Amino acid sequence: MIVLGIDPALGSLGWAVVARQLTKLKYLASGIIKTNSKDEIHNRLACINSTLEKVILEYQPNMAAIEETFVNTNSVTSLKLGYARGAIMSLCGRYNLDIREFKPNTVKKTVTGYGHAEKDQILHMIKLLLPGTSLITNSDEADAIAIAYTCHVMRVK
């Protein structure tokens, strides 16, 4: 089973690919997709989709795990994040990926044992749980790894 973990965002989206090999989880790859806030939204969404599509084609995941988003006090920000999530889900649907969504607190609790963990705690635990992640420094990327990890752990339960 190969899971594509996604920390959705319009400005700096984190993605990660984590595979289960027998009883072990293996980190395969991760990255961030940055878009320019000055670009039109459709161009930003196209950038996200084209980059994620390359990841899907290269790693052939069976499933996508996406962090659920909370409603921001700024309705415009929430709406734009909704656009990004919709574009991502549409892309996953085009490649017949099963989609699982996880609340941020669930991801934090699964990875750190504490549902209100800080970004640096998630980053620290990811490095302990998955060999190959020691050079990860970006919190969006770490969140995506944590989301993929959570998906694997939750599927076993």
UniProtKB/Swiss-Prot annotation:
Cofactor(s), names only, from the UniProt record: Mg(2+)
Keyword Lipid biosynthesis: no
Enzyme Commission number(s): 3.1.21.10
CDD domains: RuvC (cd16962)
Keywords: Cytoplasm, DNA damage, DNA recombination, DNA repair, DNA-binding, Endonuclease, Hydrolase, Magnesium, Metal-binding, Nuclease
Disulphides: none
Compartments in which it is found: Cytoplasm
Pfam families, per the entry: RuvC
Annotated cofactor note: Binds 2 Mg(2+) ion per subunit.
Reaction catalysed by this enzyme: Endonucleolytic cleavage at a junction such as a reciprocal single-stranded crossover between two homologous DNA duplexes (Holliday junction)
Function of the molecule: The RuvA-RuvB-RuvC complex processes Holliday junction (HJ) DNA during genetic recombination and DNA repair. Endonuclease that resolves HJ intermediates. Cleaves cruciform DNA by making single-stranded nicks across the HJ at symmetrical positions within the homologous arms, yielding a 5'-phosphate and a 3'-hydroxyl group; requires a central core of homology in the junction. The consensus cleavage sequence is 5'-(A/T)TT(C/G)-3'. Cleavage occurs on the 3'-side of the TT dinucleotide at the point of strand exchange.
Protein name according to UniProt: Crossover junction endodeoxyribonuclease RuvC
